[in-house]
């Protein structure tokens, strides 16, 4: 077979014209050491702080230390297969996680990968894990409540949408229980919840997920889990991932609630990473920027204005403000709130709910110390009826705690002091509440109304909770219209007050408790 030179040249020309050569210009370097999930890389010149780096075996890392002749990175996931001399490439991207309604009802890891065995998430959008918080101009003051369903919190330490309220206390004193009850109480309230579990046992996280499923709360909840068995990098990133998922709803005019359980473990993970990266240690061996670690996270929780939402959605959503409410949890050691991380987070947040082991062990649960718990902005968001009725409760409790301390030393007490102590005992009993049984607004209002108007004063302390429960059942069956009015208006009119007085008197006469 004879080949025609002109045909060959034509063929070569057509091949050259049809060639699609894609130039992939990427910076690359070499691994010079791998220890404890920390990699040192030589030869990378153009790297951003927090940029994703690509390692062999489809593994990614995060650039954290940018030095003159090397880059310190932390590996996300397994690192056993990475060795000295491996090639590392830059990606030009900051770490992103999937966001959107597809995540609701799912359990994911810190990178947004599903870990609940229900198949892929199929989220249409991703967003950067680190974002700048909305500016002062775009924020609105807190004015709508987040009902926790817990008597002691809703009456004395109210939380508003867009607030940051710290839950602080020693281990095993009910911090997670308060957070889970708050999530359970959001059923039907149009509030998306995100629960971020950091450094907990996998079995504990599983128990929480199971409880949320049983109560039907998983339908509106995203669980982000970075268990104790996962790397320090994953525990460090989990809160930022959860926050980005929550911001998706905030920026589109919806309301979201995020719980970080707990930020002490995140600070420990960050300390571990920083020490391995040879950053200079400071107080309690934490790095110098541990305050910034938490402030940049918690400042992203905010109530944003209608203009912000309209601008963000390019006019698709109009006249709706969005909010992200944060409930960070901090674990103290032997009640020491003056340690480094607790003082940092107390100064960042808009108030704290302080849980005490002594109260917990005495059977007062939730174990909230009303004297030192405070909500700096939530009062503006409290429902009218609760605001009207709760003032007396806080005063009664504060006076009771003070008098109880003196009463230990005094043998004979005057009548007024004795009455105050008796009322305090009954109010303390009234504020006890079993786990997973959050209350509606009308139920809370009726309980506070009974205490304020002296209907509990002539009861034995042990009869207070049965009386409260019986009264609720009685009102449900005999005064459904009154309940509906209180629940709908979130207020107590003069007529409703009179009707409630009459109903409680009738119930007390019946003695059905």
UniProtKB/Swiss-Prot annotation:
Site positions (Required for activity):
373
Q: Which positions in this protein are listed as binding ATP?
A: 169-176
Gene3D superfamilies given in the database record: 2.40.30.20, ATP synthase alpha/beta chain, C-terminal domain (1.20.150.20), P-loop containing nucleotide triphosphate hydrolases (3.40.50.300)
Molecular function per GO = ADP binding; ATP binding; proton-transporting ATP synthase activity, rotational mechanism
Annotated GO CC locations: plasma membrane; proton-transporting ATP synthase complex
Which topology term describes how it sits in the membrane? Peripheral membrane protein
Name the catalysed reactions. ATP + H2O + 4 H(+)(in) = ADP + phosphate + 5 H(+)(out)
Q: What EC number is given for this enzyme?
A: 7.1.2.2
The answer to whether keyword Chloroplast applies is no
Q: Does the keyword Ribonucleoprotein apply?
A: no
Query: Which family is this sequence assigned to?
Result: Belongs to the ATPase alpha/beta chains family.
HAMAP family from the xrefs?
A: ATP_synth_alpha_bact
Subunit-level organization: F-type ATPases have 2 components, CF(1) - the catalytic core - and CF(0) - the membrane proton channel. CF(1) has five subunits: alpha(3), beta(3), gamma(1), delta(1), epsilon(1). CF(0) has three main subunits: a(1), b(2) and c(9-12). The alpha and beta chains form an alternating ring which encloses part of the gamma chain. CF(1) is attached to CF(0) by a central stalk formed by the gamma and epsilon chains, while a peripheral stalk is formed by the delta and b chains.
Q: What is this protein called?
A: ATP synthase subunit alpha 1
Protein species of origin? Burkholderia thailandensis (strain ATCC 700388 / DSM 13276 / CCUG 48851 / CIP 106301 / E264)
């Amino acid at each position: 077979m004879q080949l025609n030179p002109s045909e060959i040249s034509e063929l070569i020309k057509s091949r050259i014209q049809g060639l699609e050569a894609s130039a992939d210009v990427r910076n690359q370097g070499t691994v010079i050491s791998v220890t404890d999930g920390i990699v040192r890389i030589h030869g990378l010149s153009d790297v951003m702080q927090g940029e994703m780096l690509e390692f062999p075996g489809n593994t990614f890392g995060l650039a954290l230390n940018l030095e003159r002749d090397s880059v310190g990175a932390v590996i996300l996931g397994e690192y056993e297969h990475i060795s000295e001399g491996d090639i590392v490439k830059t990606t030009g991207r900051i770490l992103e996680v999937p966001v959107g309604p597809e995540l609701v009802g799912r359990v994911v890891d810190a990178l947004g990968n599903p870990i609940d065995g229900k198949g892929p998430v199929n989220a249409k959008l991703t967003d950067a894990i680190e974002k700048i918080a909305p500016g002062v101009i775009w924020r609105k003051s807190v004015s709508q409540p987040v009902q926790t369903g817990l008597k002691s919190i809703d009456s004395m330490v109210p939380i508003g949408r867009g607030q940051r309220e710290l839950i602080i206390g020693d281990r095993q004193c009910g911090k997670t229980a308060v957070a889970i009850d708050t999530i359970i109480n959001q059923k039907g309230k149009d509030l998306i919840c995100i629960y971020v579990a950091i450094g907990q046992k996998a079995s504990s996280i599983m128990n929480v997920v199971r409880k949320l499923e049983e109560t039907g709360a998983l339908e509106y909840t995203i669980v982000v889990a970075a268990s104790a068995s996962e790397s320090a990098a994953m525990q460090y990133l989990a809160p930022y991932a959860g926050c980005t998922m929550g911001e998706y709803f905030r920026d589109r005019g919806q309301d979201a609630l995020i719980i970080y359980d707990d930020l002490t473990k995140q600070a420990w993970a960050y300390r571990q990473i920083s020490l391995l990266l040879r950053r200079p240690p400071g107080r309690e061996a934490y790095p110098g920027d541990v305050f910034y670690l938490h402030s940049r996270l918690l400042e992203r929780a905010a109530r944003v204005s209608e203009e912000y939402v309209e601008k963000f959605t390019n006019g698709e959503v109009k006249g709706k403000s969005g909010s992200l409410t944060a409930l960070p949890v901090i674990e103290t050691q032997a009640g020491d709130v003056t340690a480094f991380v607790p003082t940092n987070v107390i100064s960042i947040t808009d108030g704290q709910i302080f849980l005490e082991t002594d109260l917990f062990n005495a059977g007062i649960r939730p174990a909230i110390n009303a004297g030192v718990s405070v909500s700096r902005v939530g009062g503006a968001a409290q429902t009218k009826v609760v605001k009207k009725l709760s003032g007396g409760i806080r005063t009664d409790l504060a006076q009771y705690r003070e008098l109880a301390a003196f009463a230990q030393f005094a043998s004979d007490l005057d009548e007024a002091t004795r009455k105050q102590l008796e009322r305090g005992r009954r109010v303390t009993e009234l504020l006890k509440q079993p786990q997973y049984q959050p209350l509606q607004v009308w139920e809370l209002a009726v309980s506070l109304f009974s205490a304020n108007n002296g209907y509990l004063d002539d009861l034995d302390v042990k009869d207070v909770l049965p009386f409260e429960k019986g009264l609720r059942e009685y009102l449900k069956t005999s005064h459904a219209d009154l309940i509906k009015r209180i629940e709908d208006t979130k207020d107590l009119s003069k007529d409703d007050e009179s009707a409630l007085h009459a109903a409680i008197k009738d119930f007390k006469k019946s003695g059905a408790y």
